[in-house]
């Protein structure tokens, strides 16, 4: 046996120590090089409620947020007149459509207000416990924080997805800038002084690359708004965030996506109203440019005459002749209408995360 005190033993020991040191140094450098992504994935993995083959695929994240407010739309039992369930059956179909069409090119993340405290470092606000309109304001801020940290695409949970959103997303961020989608203007202040603004930007349908400086600026702006003692007084009327985004669009810092692509407009540039979605008369969407149609979920809940749709069972919806039912059926079918998308490798499974 060779002694470590012999000449050969000393040389062997020195070489061994040198190899171990080099391996440790290389390992440390490699860890530092990959740690940001690894830490991000580990953070999300920690708060998953279901197993998902997420890791190892370099895909952007697609964020779908749902609210679980205390409501009386569907009772759990005869003695219970309210619950905190989602209680909107059609949303289960819209979310399924997004997962089905986009799950092979995005890591789909299903989140709620409680997810923010888990995924955003140093986030201490309990959004679910806030009253309105503060809750929505802080929710918008938190969604921007998620986009800044992780990047990806925010998609409303009431979007009926007909085609993969990958092309829309990548064309939106091709200049390394964020993008927002155009939606119908609901802000009264935009129509003051004789102006009649039909459409404006809306951050509910938005995409951005990770660590975007413009998203960082938006976050700082929203923080200033939340620090304002008067910010609770009708923020929707003034549309502060939309005005800020519109200004950045004019400066070419943010890209505006035509509402035609998300089905809030017809091919004739006419606004798609709720009545039309719930009617049987065909709507002229673009067969090549419309990726899906956005059901105005907030309006359906606010307007009594449409609330019946929010509680209608899924099987009953799909049996009707409503336009929205036809598109829901199409979104869940196995046949793709478009043939301009190349097939994704079978090794890329659909990934869905509930956070």
Protein language model regions, located:
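Glycosyltransferase-associated regions of secretory-pathway enzymes
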Residues: 1-139, 157-355
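Small-residue hinge/turn detector
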Residues: 140-152
């Amino acid at each position: 046996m060779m002694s470590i005190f012999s000449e050969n033993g000393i040389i062997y020991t020195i070489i061994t120590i040198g190899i171990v040191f080099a391996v440790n140094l290389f390992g440390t450098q490699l860890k530092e090089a990959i740690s940001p992504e690894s830490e991000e994935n580990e953070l999300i993995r920690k708060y998953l409620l279901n197993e998902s083959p997420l890791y190892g695929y370099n895909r952007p994240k697609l964020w779908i947020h749902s609210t679980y407010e205390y409501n009386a739309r569907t009772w759990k039992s005869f003695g219970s007149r309210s619950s905190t369930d989602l209680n909107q059956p059609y949303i289960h179909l819209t979310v399924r459509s997004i997962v089905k069409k986009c799950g092979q090119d995005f890591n789909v993340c299903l989140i709620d207000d409680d997810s923010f405290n888990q995924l955003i470092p140093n986030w201490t606000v309990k959004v679910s416990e806030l009253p309105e309109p503060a809750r929505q304001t802080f929710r918008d801020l938190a969604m921007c924080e998620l986009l800044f940290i992780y990047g990806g695409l925010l998609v409303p949970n009431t979007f009926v997805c007909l085609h993969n959103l990958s092309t829309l997303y990548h064309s939106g961020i091709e200049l390394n800038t964020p993008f927002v989608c155009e939606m119908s203007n609901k802000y009264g202040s935009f129509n003051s002084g004789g102006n009649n603004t039909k459409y404006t930007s809306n951050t509910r349908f938005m995409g951005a690359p990770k660590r975007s400086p413009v998203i960082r600026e938006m976050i700082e702006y929203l923080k200033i708004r939340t620090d304002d003692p008067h910010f609770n007084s009708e923020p929707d009327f003034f549309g502060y965030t939309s005005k800020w985004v519109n200004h950045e669009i004019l400066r070419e810092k943010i890209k505006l996506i035509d509402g035609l692509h998300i089905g809030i407009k017809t091919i004739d540039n006419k606004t798609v109203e709720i009545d039309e979605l719930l009617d049987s008369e065909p709507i002229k969407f673009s067969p090549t440019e419309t990726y899906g149609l956005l059901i105005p979920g907030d309006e359906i809940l606010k307007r009594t005459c449409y609330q019946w749709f929010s509680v209608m069972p899924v099987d009953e919806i799909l049996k009707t002749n409503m336009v929205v039912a036809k598109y829901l059926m199409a979104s869940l079918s196995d046949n793709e209408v478009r043939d301009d998308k190349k097939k994704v490798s079978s090794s890329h499974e659909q990934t869905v995360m509930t956070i």
